[in-house]
Structure formats: C-alpha cells, structure tokens
UniProtKB/Swiss-Prot annotation:
It comes from the Bacteria. The chain crosses the membrane at residues 1-21, 43-63, 83-103, 112-132, 192-212, 224-244, 257-277. Catalyzes the dephosphorylation of undecaprenyl diphosphate (UPP). Confers resistance to bacitracin. This is Undecaprenyl-diphosphatase 1. The gene is uppP1. It is found in: Cell membrane. Belongs to the UppP family. Its EC number is 3.6.1.27. It is a multi-pass membrane protein. GO terms for cellular component: plasma membrane. GO terms for molecular function: undecaprenyl-diphosphatase activity. It catalyses: di-trans,octa-cis-undecaprenyl diphosphate + H2O = di-trans,octa-cis-undecaprenyl phosphate + phosphate + H(+). Bacitracin is thought to be involved in the inhibition of peptidoglycan synthesis by sequestering undecaprenyl diphosphate, thereby reducing the pool of lipid carrier available. InterPro entries: UppP.
C-alpha cells in the first residue's frame, strides 16, 4: 500500500504539472510509467491516468468558479450573459473533438499509442510553437479576451483540439497553438484551453472509468485509496501550475515550451531505440 500511494503521488505530480502546460502529459507519463508502474494491471493503469485528470479539472473549476457559474447573487445581467456566452463557446469548441474522438478514439489507442508516434508529435508541435510565435511576434492580437471570441474562432480552436487525439500532441498545446495562430492573445488562448478541458476531459474520464467498472467490476479498497491520492495530488499541483502559467505568459511567449518539447521528443526516441520504453 505504501509504495502504491508513493507511486500515485509521483504520477499525480507529473499529471498536475503537464496537463495544462503545452508539453503533453502523455509524453511524460509514457516515460515515467516505465520506472513508476502504478499497477501490473494495464486496464487499471489506464483508468488511473484518466482519474487523476479529474483532479486537474477540479483545479480549473475552482480557479474560475466565479467566471463559470452563472447563478447566485452579486452578478450583473451582463456578467451572467458573458458566463452563458462562454459556455456556448465551450460547447461549440468541443463539438469537433467529440465527433472525431467518438469515431477514432479506439483506433487511435490501438494503432498510435506508442513511443514513436508520441516522440514525433512532441517534436512537430514543438517546432510549430516556435514558428507560430516567431510569425506572430510583431503582430497585435486580434482577440484579447474570451468575451471577444466569435463562434467561428472557437470552432477553429475546436478543430485544433481534434489534433490532440494523436498521442504526444497535448490537448492544451493544440488548443493554445490554434488560438495563437488565428490571432488570439496568449492569455485568452490559455484560458479558453482551460475551459475546453472541462467537458472534454470530464467526458473521456467518465467513459474510461465506466468502461473499467463494466469490464472489471468495482475497485478494491486499495485501488480506491490510490485513485483518490493521485487525484488529490494532481488537483493541488495543477492549481499551482495554472496560476504560474498565467503569470508566466504575461511577460513570456511559448517558445520555451516548444524547445522543451523538441528535447523531450528526442529523449523519447533515444529511450525507445535502446528499448527502455516500449
């Protein structure tokens, strides 16, 4: 039990750090999992990875509660309207990934969940971040806040999110890159990426958990403890990381993350080539 909890803490930290940074949580977990296996049961390991995502989602909801909850006192009609408008944009933004994900998710997991695909995605999107940031360097953002996003804008960002079905792409990376490439400010692109994560990650996590319970029955007591520990650690770390990222991008661009992705991608290739990861 002790070592199971320790592994859950380590993986929760990795998930909390990488989920909302554009560096691919999958790319990191595929490496860490080789050294810190939460379980010999592959189905439980996969389910654990989706459960700890719930902790990261809770961090977003808690941080942005006032901007996401339209009910209760103290809000003007304009504020309520903006909140409902934000939710409409989120729903429109997730439509492409819901459709494509439903059609291709199982095929992607079967054929693309390997270190080579992950490493290529890390490198390709790392280069894309550097290119887009250089291209947009001297351009003023066309959209500075989520309130100014049009439905056409969010649909385009939603199609970028579809790219994250490929392992190693990074859901946050794809949506932030998509936002910046169409002229959205870094802050607005990052925040909308956080908001899109709520229905996207919640839906996938619930489906994966339901699938596990249907196939394997209820979790054991030890498994429940491990899941809760991992989810709580992911929540705490993600909360801190989101606040840090929002401060960071006020004075920095995303090129550093692009270079980091390239280095990580090369590392994954090296580890895969010598057989350390499979």
């Amino acid at each position: 039990m002790f070592f199971g909890i320790l592994k859950a803490i380590i993986l929760g930290i990795v998930e909390g750090i990488t989920e909302f940074l554009p560096i691919s949580s999958t790319g990191h977990l595929i490496i860490v999992d080789q050294f810190v296996k939460i379980s010999s049961n592959k189905a439980f390991t996969t389910t654990f990875e989706y459960v700890i995502q719930l902790g990261a989602i809770i961090a977003v909801v808690l941080l942005y509660w006032k901007r996401l909850w339209p009910f209760g006192g103290g809000k003007t009609e304009k504020q309520r309207f903006n909140i409902w408008a934000t939710w409409v944009k989120v729903v429109v933004g997730v439509i492409p990934s819901v459709i494509i994900g439903f059609l291709l998710n199982d095929w992607m997991d079967k054929h693309l969940m390997n270190w080579l695909v992950v490493s290529i995605a890390l490198i390709v999107y790392g280069i894309a971040f550097i290119f887009i940031e250089n291209y947009q360097k001297n351009r003023r953002p066309r959209v500075r806040t989520i309130n100014h996003l049009t439905l056409a804008d969010v649909l385009k960002i939603g199609f970028f999110q579809v790219l994250s079905i490929v392992p190693g792409t990074s859901r946050s990376g794809a949506t932030i890159l998509g936002g910046i490439s169409i002229g959205v400010s870094r802050e607005a692109a990052a925040e909308f990426s956080f908001f899109l994560s709520i229905p996207t990650m919640l839906g996938v996590s619930v489906l994966k958990i339901g699938s596990y319970l249907h196939s394997h029955g209820m979790f054991s007591g030890e498994q429940i403890v491990i899941l809760l520990v991992g989810m709580f650690v992911s929540f705490v770390v993600a909360y801190v990381v989101i606040k840090w990222l929002l401060r960071f991008i006020q004075t920095h661009d995303f090129k550093a993350f692009g270079w980091y992705r390239i280095i990580l991608g090369v590392l994954v290739i090296a580890l895969g080539a010598i057989g350390i990861i499979d």
